[in-house]
Curated annotation (Swiss-Prot):
Belongs to the universal ribosomal protein uL29 family. Disulfide bonds: none annotated. InterPro entries: Ribosomal_protein_uL29, Ribosomal_uL29, Ribosomal_uL29_sf. This is Large ribosomal subunit protein uL29. Keywords: Ribonucleoprotein, Ribosomal protein. GO terms for molecular function: structural constituent of ribosome. The lineage of its organism: Bacteria, Bacillati, Bacillota, Bacilli, Bacillales. The gene is rpmC. It holds the Pfam family Ribosomal_L29. GO terms for biological process: translation.
Length: 65
């Protein structure tokens, strides 16, 4: 999801999205460790999505953007 899409969501929706992304990242790491993960690039995508969401949340806290 792009940063502009996160800006259109409510704070609660973004926080819920971050929680689900963290769970997905946790599962992806386990799949990687057990050799079941085929698309390792998904880990990077999920990490970037978490960062985007947290950035938007922080901008809201500071009143930026």
């Amino acid at each position: 999801m792009k940063a502009n899409e996160y800006r259109n969501l409510t704070t609660a929706e973004i926080e819920q999205n971050v929680t689900s992304l963290k769970e997905e990242l946790f599962n992806l790491r386990f799949q990687l460790a057990t050799g079941q993960l085929e698309t390792t690039s998904r880990i990077k995508q999920v990490r970037k999505d978490i960062a985007r969401a947290k950035t938007v949340l922080r901008q809201r806290e500071l009143g930026i953007g």
